Amino acid sequence: MTVILDPRGPRSACRAAGPAAAKLKGDHSTGQQMFANIAPDTTITAIEPLRSDPTMRRVRVGRKTIATVQAADVEAMGLAVGLDWTDQLAQRVQRAVETHQARGAALGLLNRRAYSCGELIDRLARRGHSSQVAVSIAQELATAGLIDDEAYGRAIARETVATKPASQEFLARKLRERRIPDDLAQRIACETLADVDLVEAATQYARKRLHAMPTVSRTTATRRIAAALARRGFDADTIAATLGRLNQAPLTDQPAT
């Protein structure tokens, strides 16, 4: 599935990133132990381009290759041969390595299907990336237009009501399950159903369900239809109105109650 892009640009900018980060369990850095055996008084001895990828640099400290980072990160961090390898520098390089790995993982996920910011943060966290890096990458990709919570949410909303009717609350709940922020989920649900006659939509659905139960008594069929509508989030008044319309046109092939 291709990534959903909106020509107007990203709409959410990962507004759910803050709350999502708070819900993540722990801070599992993929590179936590990568510098454990490097003496703090060692210096950078080489920074070499990779033959397989000229945009990447291999960083050596002492006799050990310590990390492979992007050339842009080398410049941004001011890495140079002879620079002292300090704990602070090690942490910065570790963060750059993990950020690069997380970005690659995120792009791989987005190549398969679209995600909301919250979903992507959760997936990166489950793969072991720290919450801080996961949020940072999601925000970066949202700014670039590769994640768009509003476009993604609208696509889900259209798909949800394409074959079965749904109430506004049901639709908003489905969007929240896909980690769409609550205020955006409510707005999308409201706008999706703005021109929909919910009683008429529910009645058409009920008639299809009734036709699919030719050997079931009318009483049992009505009970099942009412339960199905309740599961789709319809309130008691809408269900009653739907069943009233249904009973106005009884089917002759239904068994007697």
Question: Residue spans of the language-model regions?
Answer:
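An alpha-helical, amphipathic repeat domain used for nucleic-acid recognition
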Residues: 1-257
